Amino acid sequence: MCEPSGSDDAMVHASEMVDGDEMIHGNEMVVHDSVMIDGNEMVQENVMVHGSGEMVQGSEMVHNNEIIQVNDMIQVNEMVNGDKMAHGHELVGVELTTPTASRRRRKKSVVWEHFTIEEMPGGVSRASCNLCKQTFAYSCGSKISGTSHLKRHITLASCPMLKNEDMKLSLPLATVTNNDGEGCAERVAKRHYRSTGYANAMFDQDRTCSNLAKMIILHDYPLHIVEQRGFTAFIGSLQPRFRVIDVDTIEGQVHSVYQKERENLMHVFSTVPGRISLTVRLWATSQTLGYISLAAQFIDTEWRVHRRMVNFMMVSSPHSENSLSEAISTSLSDWNMKDKLFTITLDNDPSSHDIYSANMINYLSNKKDNIMIKGQLFVVRCYAHILNTVAQDVIASVHSVIYHIRESIKFIKASSVHEDKFAEIALQLEIPSAKTLCLDVTTQWNTTYLMLLAALDYQQVFASLETCDGDYNEAPSTEDWKKVEAACSYLSLLYDSAHNIMAAPNPTSNIFFHEAWKLQSELSNAIAHEDPIFRSTAKIMHERFDKYWKDCNLVLAIAVVMDPRFKMKLVEFSYSKIHSVEAAKYVKVVDDAIHELYSEYATQGEANRDAHVTDNSAAVTPPNGDELLDFDIYLSEIATSQPSISELEQYLEEALMPRIQDFEILEWWKLNTIKFPTLSKMARDVLAIPMSMVSSGSSIFSATATGSQMLDDYRSSLRPETVEALFCAKDWLQYPPATTEAPSTALVKMEN
């Protein structure tokens, strides 16, 4: 075997490697561990293994009973199928056997791509930096110093050669493992840097500031967090090169994020095929000023529902109908949606609903907005708001009883002795209930209902406890329990209705009619209850809910007609339960309105088709001598002489779809768009009407879920433009840029 030329280190100069083996470019120095060449050959701490050759410590290798010095230079031009051809010399591979006991550990830490181990006298090893040649302690005998200090030398730019900013490196710390690891027989590829997006990227001050602004927006952090000492110290420990910014700078970054996301949303709105409905929420402040938030809801080309906040505007008089109308008009102009508005949903007090409706219709009509069917559907009241309002009315009617029950539960929960005594009495009286007594959260009426419901089962226990414990004197009277029973009876209707709405995976407008008509029917019957206590409670609820029903039953009914499982049949059935002999009159109102609405959509469709035909008339003119021209005239005459049936009539006359559990109404309309091209446009807009202000998946029981909300003092102190940027950008950042993609089985998260 010819002796290769020598050098200080083992170098392989490779031009080509065939059969899946690794190519090493240029004069790449192989001086560290964990490098496999040709799938068999490995250089590890000056030990070379060929094939399955035996490893020998030091710088020698036993190869077919010959000792070969490793510190030699081998020029390799070609490697074919594992056999080697040496440039100028002949190198013959010989199959060897390797005792498994002689296998050594491979080093896995990425720092070894920057350091070389040097053997020192006395069995000491030191790690030498490949760039600055500075050495560091590594091992002394069996004691190993680890790699943390080596990693700091590179990552913190302690190396003099890394002082130049262009040469600074960032090690992928997530991949750092223990210094040593067990070796394995399989082929291991040479480690190279692979960018994962940030680990090896150069530091970018502007990008970091933008991400910091997004963090502040998404998590409601104050702008002055950038000047807080703890925050600056934390950031400095993560990235010393980050230049600390002030409040004005981060505020500018927030506005930049807002503008970029607004442009993305503008693009989304330009692709919306139908109309857009708005929700309007009032925000109060500790000052005399107020804010209103506007959110747009729509269905996209793929029949998926979306809601996006569009404005958070300061108004001088938020409860003024003129201020609301002006703000809405300004928003529509800013977003180029003046011709796309369909409905507006409010959570205002019902007593002012008519005033708001009339003012908005008149104001926006004067602005020549295209309002459908003379504004009959234009202003919608929030269903969640009416549920909360009615529930609070019921709770207020039994406020004194609730106080006694709360105090009773506090007494029982005050000590384990009281709890044991209460449980003992319940056992003696053989109370079958397994409910647990617990205090309510006063701002969430559902917890009050559940508290009353549990206490109702233990009314005898409370009475017995009062007779045997002189310290307890809060037991409600028999009449009080009667009031609680009546309150729970009717609160259960509201509770179940709210749960049904929240449980809907896709709360389109059609599902609200089912809940509303059942409540209206139950309360209408309850006001004639023979028990005066039940009758009194029902009357309180009916007065409030009946006003909502009169204001919104038309839009609710039209929405359910767009459900192919019910159509007009459910309207006819429910109205017969509510209005009895006068049902036909109210059914006709719905029927007339839905035909009028369809007629407007059909007229708009014909106008668009006429314009399209005019623009393309030259392209469709038949050539001279068309033998089927007379046939076309014949078909036209037949069509005009025979009465045609509209898409709406065809839809209503067809059989109802089965009421299956997982019926997807939006998917059904998507599949039937070709069959009902005009009616599907109408269905798209109607089903997108936001009947509730509460986000999908959120609780509607909280007092803050509906009605006016309070803006905290900090945000009230900010400039109105900054407040709007913070609120809107937080909503927009939840979604991918310039897209309306969302799961088709659930309504996307709405503005909270």
UniProtKB/Swiss-Prot annotation:
BED-type ZnF: 106-166
Keyword Transcription: yes
Residues that coordinate or bind Zn(2+): C129, C132, H153, C159
A Pfam family per the record: hAT-like_RNase-H
Keyword annotations of the record: DNA-binding, Metal-binding, Nucleus, Transcription, Transcription regulation, Zinc, Zinc-finger
SUPFAM superfamilies assigned: beta-beta-alpha zinc fingers (SSF57667), Ribonuclease H-like (SSF53098)
GO cellular component: nucleus
Lineage top rank: taxon: Eukaryota
GO term, biological process aspect, one: post-embryonic development
Keyword Metal-binding among UniProt keywords: yes
Main localization (coarse): nucleus
Subcellular location: Nucleus
Entry GO MF terms: DNA binding; protein dimerization activity; zinc ion binding
Region of interest (HATC (Hobo-Ac-Tam3) domain), ranges: 647-733
Summary of subunit composition and partner proteins: Homodimer.
Primary role: Transposase-like protein that is essential for plant growth and development. May regulate global gene expression by recruiting other cellular factors.
Protein's name according to its UniProt entry: Zinc finger BED domain-containing protein RICESLEEPER 3
